[in-house]
Amino acid sequence: MTAFSLEPAQLAWCAELRALAAERLRPLAEKGEPGRVNRALLAGLGTLGLLPRLFTSGALDLCLMRESLAHACTEAETALALQGLGAHPVHAHGTEAQRARWLPRVSDGSAVAAFALSEPDAGSDAAALTLAADPDPRPGGSPGWRLTGEKRWISNAPEADFYTVFARTTPGAGARGITAFLVPADRPGLTGTPLDMLSPHPIGALAFDAVPVTPDDVLGEPDRGFRVAMGTLNLFRPSVGAFAVGMAQAALDATLAHTAARDAFGGKLRDLQTVAHQVAEMALRTESARLMVYAAATAYDDGAPDVPRRAAMAKLLATETAQYVVDRAVQLHGARALCRGHLLEHLYREVRAPRVYEGASEVQRGIIAKELYRTLDATANGTAGVTANGTAGVTTNGTANATANGTAGVTTKEAGA
C-alpha cells in the first residue's frame, strides 16, 4: 500500500465487512441483553472467520476490521476487540499448552477472554497496581503464588472464561515487579460482580481471595508482565482509534442524509451555510483521524521505532474527533437523536468511553510529549531508544524509558466499553 491510500482489495474487504456487520451481526447484537456477554454474537464472529484474524492480521488489518464493523454494529466491533485484547497476550507470550487450550476456543467464540489490568486505585497509573501475588511454597508440590486483591472496570467480567491478569510479584519495584498470569474463571477464590455502565457492554469487578496460580499460568516471564501489557496496548491503541473513526463515519453519514432531506426555513438544511460548514468540519476531522490511525498501524507493521508516539497520537486524535463528530451530529439532528433507539443516541453513549480506556486522552498527551523529549535526548546523547514495537524501551546503558516501557499508564478497554 501507499502512505495515503488503501489497495482495491482492502477497500473491497472493508465494504464486505460493513455488509456482514449490518446483515449478519446486527440482528445477533439486537437479541443480546445489555451488560451481558453476547455469546451468540461471538459465535457469529467466529463463524464468519473474523475472530481467527485477530491472531493472523497485522495492525492495519485490525484497524480496517474494527472501523468497518463499528460503522454498522458497535456491539460486534467491541465483542471482537475484547476477545483480541484478552487473548493477544496468550497468543504472543503463552506456552504451547496455554495456546492450545484457549486460542482455538477464542477463535470460534466458544471461550470469552478478558484483559484484567485496572484496579480501583490503579487506572491511568497502571504501574501502581496492588493485586498481590504472594509466594505459595506448596510443600510437596510446585511453588506458585496466591493472588489477593481486586480488579475493576474489566470488560467481559464477570462472565469471561479466562482472564489475563496482571499482579505484583515484587513489591516496591514499580513496573518491573509485575507478572502476567492466565487465570481460568473457575479458579477457587475468584469471584466477580457486574457493573451498570453507560454503554451496553459487559463490564465488571473481580475479587481475588488467595486465588492459586502456578508457573504454568505465567504469560512471558515473572516480573516482566508490564511488557506484556504494553506490547498488547501498543498493538490495540491504533485500532481503538479505528473504532472511533468507524463511529464518526456512521454519524457523518447519518448527518449527510438527514440534512439533505430535512426541510427547514424554506429549503433544505444542507443549504444553510452554518450547517454545511459544520458538516464539512465533521468530514475534515474524520478523514484526518482515519489517516493518522492508518499511519500508526502501518508504522507498527513496519517495526518503526516510534510506535508508542504514533499509537498515542492516533488514539488521541481519533477518539476526540469521534466525540466531536457524534456531538455535532446530535445537534444537527435535534431532539430525534436523543430518542432511545436512535442511531445517534446509541453512538452518543458508545463514543464517550474510548477517551478513557486503554490510556485516557491525558495519558496519551503525556506519552506523546515524553516520546518527543526522549527522542530529542537520545539524539543529543547518541543513545538507542525503543525497540521496533515499543515494548522494551531500553537505552544503550540499560536504563528503562518511560512510555516506551509502559510507565505511561492505561485504563484498558475495561472502563465503560
Language model region names:
Residues 109-117:
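A short, Trp-centered hydrophobic/proline-enriched beta-strand micro-motif
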Residues 1-72, 93, 105, 109, ...:
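Alpha-helical interface subdomain recognition
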